[in-house]
Structure formats: C-alpha cells, structure tokens
Amino acid sequence: MSDHREQQKDEIDLLQNIIFDKMKIVESEPNFKIFMEIKSDIEDPKMKFHLTVTLNEEYPDKEPTFELLEVNNYLASAKVRDLESKLSSLCQEYINMPMLYQMYECILSFADEEEEKLLKEEKEIQK
C-alpha cells in the first residue's frame, strides 16, 4: 500500500471515529470516495448538506475533488457557491495535510451560522 493510500485510510478511520454515522465510504477503489451528511446541531435544523469527497492518488499532497449539495434548498445558490469557495480555499490552505475533518467543520460552522440567521428572521416575522 502506498504512503498516500495509507495516510488516506488512517484519516478516514479517524474521521469515522469522530463523526460516526454521518459519514460513509462510497468507494474504496481505485480512489476513496466518501459521503458526509452535515446539519446544524440546533433543534430541528432546516438545512442539510451532503458532501461527497473523492481523494485522488496523491491526496493530501493534492487537493481532493468534492461536490456539495444543500438538500432542503433553504439557501440561495449564491450562498452555496460561497461555501464551495470557502471549501476550495480551505483545501488549498491544507495541502500536504489531512483536511477532511476541517471540511466537515467548515460546513458545520456555516450551517450553524445560517440556521441562527433563519431563526432570527422567523422571530422577526412573528413579531
């Protein structure tokens, strides 16, 4: 097993121990492809994100490819593009280092912020 492949497997194993049932391995050959479901920890969140990440042979020395989807369509597409841009920047920042957990945390933090904004707006409307 190559060093990159071993690093990838170790990172995925560690991530599974942290986020448990919110992640699954979709493919393991020829490259790892993982799926994460991410939503805010607030009660009854409106938004849910699906992140699919494919690790190329050279990951983490080369950034992974990813696809992000906001499942419930609560966000404007421009906001989703902003989040994708944040993820791309994060991937560039973490070149040569494990970054899957950072990607997860980036989306979770974004979801928390947006959910709080939605709650505020709903409360304002109810007044």
Task: Specify the residue positions occupied by each region the protein language model found.
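N-terminal ordered "arm"
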Residues: 16-42
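Canonical SH2 domain fold
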Residues: 33-70
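Glycine-centered motif in EGF-like
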Residues: 2-26, 59-127
